């Protein structure tokens, strides 16, 4: 495992640095590192680290979501109002609809199997989007119009919505009835996540005011609580649950509301943690990619992904109708909502592991979506934000 950690960090950072020098997103180099070092090519990564890959990827996601919460300016989000709510589910719903229209004909799968594929593909990647929106907020691009806040909040809730749909469709194909409680749980889990996270943030702000400890210790406390929330969500067996990822982001928001100076300092600390977490996240996502699968569906999978993205971007366009955003700002939001990586890597292989007939197709299309959209979406954002968004 020690050799694997060394390879992940050294090779991942080096190839990422080379990509950055070539004006490409560093995550592209990290993804390529994972593909090459992973079990489907050179097989240099130890099985023990691949065995905890999902947990390590989740820790990385926790780090960037907490950092996002610590720096999120809610005043910009309040200005936008209605579109902020619509961005949480309309683009994902339209993408799912697009896949339902085209996938059964092209890939020869049933409507329910297409719904499972759509639920896997319809999530935007917080691991790609969130750090870039945090960067935009720090540099002041689009903040007055609330663009990074809108995309950041929408992308986080979008994932929760899609994962609940995925669980529901998976249950249906295994013979369970589609219970209304599953759909009622979507808004409830989001609101409970907001409430629980904000309350914890406020309590921590009060605690940090009364008990003087180092900022590093504060980070460890917040990180530990975040991990506990994830474990609690995973182990809850009741029909109504809460979203741990949204709760984690709102811990940062609650802390920021009560102790802004502390939140700013902790955001810097989390930024340093993200340097290592980003490498692990994208190298391990790359390690899940089985290149051999891709040749099996090839062009048809490409068409499905392209149609899905067109439907998704149209969904973003609809959400932003009636806002004060200009054409360039809307186009940026549409591009920012295209990258896929985290959720697809986390749930793309579940149908195959359950022995479903559509499992291999779902995993293949998910893998192709990661390889194509994560670097392309990141590249589009990195290249366009200074041209498309206003500073200050």
What are these regions (language model features)?
Residues 1-392:
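Transmembrane helical cores of multi-pass secondary ion antiporters/exchangers
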